[in-house]
Amino acid sequence: MSDETHHSPDGKMSIRKLSYLAVGSVGVVYGDIGTSPLYAFREALKPVAADGLTRGEVISLVSLMFWALTIIVTMKYVLFLLRADNDGEGGTLSLLALLMKTANGHTAVLMLLGLLGAALFLGDAMITPALSVLSAVEGLKLVTPTLSDYIVPISVAILALLFAIQSHGTGAVARFFGPITAIWFIVMGLAGIMHIADDYGILAALNPWYAVNFLMNEGFLGVVVLGAVFLTVTGAEALYADLGHFGRRPIQWAWFVLVFPSLTLNYLGQGALVLREPLAMSDPFFLMYPHWALLPVVILATMATIIASQAVITGAFSLTRQAIHLGFLPRMEILITSETNTGQIFLPSVNAILFFGVIFLVLSFKTSDALATAYGISVTGAMVVTSIMAFEFVRVRWNWTLPMAIAVLTPLLLLEFVFLGANLLKIHDGGYVPVLIATAFTVIMWTWRRGSAILMEKTRHTDIPLSSFVSSIERKSDHSPAHVPGTAIFLTSDPESAPAALLHNLKHNHVLHDKNVILTIRTTNKPRVPQEDRYSVEKVSDRFSRVELRFGFMESQNVSQALATLRKTGLKFDIMSTSFYLGRRKLVPDAKSGMPHWQDRLYIALANAATDPSDYFRLPANRVVELGSHVII
């Protein structure tokens, strides 16, 4: 999908375009939730079946799954959250960027919540590919038991290939993701319809009383079961995160016309199968199909899980770029893999981290049964964070009264906290994995944000105001620097101060260019910046100008390209007579930095690992001059 496609007003969308986007959203938005039937019902049956399985328990479990889909996915995400957008974009960091502008006194709390939500999503991006691919490949055991020993090697090979092709981009095959996943949903729905006839009594699961009665009577077992039932709605966060790719209406249409009916029918079919044949609880999904259809279904399931994994990986790339632009992570290499769509990106460092994390999980847990216990915490945590931030959103942006916000969102929050509590019971069985991953990412992002703020404050105390510097340097004297032809552009984060690179250039080279541009790059709290708002130019003196370039947090920051548009303002920009001056700082830890020593060390390590700004901002390598300095943090 191109960026242009994403932002058509929903109200003016033709039926043809709506259908096209709806099918596309099935592969990207619903890929993850579409793989849940592979393991969700099976995992929910296990704790209940320990002392024998009754008819009422099977119906109650399916009822819990149906109403989880109805309340959390349909009501919260499809009908409510898809309207809480930031200029068409959704997701935790997009919501955070919007709220930070209007936060009143609790910025730090909001920021920490947003970072936690982003970190939980990155943890989910490791677990989802491992679990979904394993669960699909395990279907081979039913085709022929001799393949049991090859499940892990085959899964590792598929995942290795998936991560290997990321650098080449997936645009060429992405057009097939939606149709393939749509076929997957249709096949699941048809299988469900066929097996509902096994026992029409399963239709009683649509009555919420079965779900409520089960939780009221089963006590602690009911809480344990909720942890498995929650697997039904994993992937719901993708609805919100991918809002900007397809728009609200196509995502809603896809849910109500195809995805929700197919999931409901499949879970009802699995339930009816187990009612008729209790031994089918060992793998109710694959046992719905006749033996001759098993291999094609396993192949289709594997394709569906690969597509779901691809969607999560792409989401991780997009989220990381947002985090970099919003100042939560250091610069990383961002490669655009499409000549026509700047939204198709590849981050080598993120790809490597995800790859090693996913392979480690597959080799450590070995089965989808074991890995399913680790799943859920990251997703429930992210959902709770989103709901809390949505509470702030409706108060600030929609002007809801406090009682109204409490009345609408408190029931959802309470339900999600119950699910979170149920998943936390699995900490010792592998649930610690997403907790550790999320903690690590949160600490990294918080450290970078805090360290950057401290560094900015320290350098500001020693900086020379730009106006004072220009006044003194342009006074005629015997010590005036020599003037050289051309333009010098000095990148700085503080446009009010003379850049360190400018001062070092004068100190060591004793020259000043005919034209000097103090350039600041700003990331706004909007996903994209209109071309007319891209830049502002302020003339400081005959030789000095102050320029600010603005980018949205979803945009690639191609500075050379943006500067070319400045010719309209009369600021001549000839790449062959322009030099870019960058300051490179060597950071030295200080006992009085305001952060613990280990955090100082972490911040310095992150700064040293950051991508060179000349590469990140797409500056011509042969026109860049770097001047270094030591800074104590």
Curated annotation (Swiss-Prot):
GO terms for molecular function: potassium ion transmembrane transporter activity; symporter activity. It holds the Pfam family K_trans_C. It catalyses: K(+)(in) + H(+)(in) = K(+)(out) + H(+)(out). Signal peptide: none annotated. The chain crosses the membrane at residues 21-41, 61-81, 107-127, 145-165, 176-196, 219-239, 255-275, 293-313, 345-365, 371-391, 402-422, 427-447. It is a multi-pass membrane protein. Its main location: membrane. It is found in: Cell inner membrane. The keyword Repressor does not apply. One of its GO terms (cellular component) is plasma membrane. Keywords: Cell inner membrane, Cell membrane, Ion transport, Membrane, Potassium, Potassium transport, Symport, Transmembrane, Transmembrane helix, Transport. The keyword Calcium does not apply. It comes from the Bacteria. Transport of potassium into the cell. Likely operates as a K(+):H(+) symporter. HAMAP family: Kup (MF_01522). Belongs to the HAK/KUP transporter (TC 2.A.72) family. This is Probable potassium transport system protein Kup. It comes from Rhizobium rhizogenes (strain K84 / ATCC BAA-868). The gene is kup.
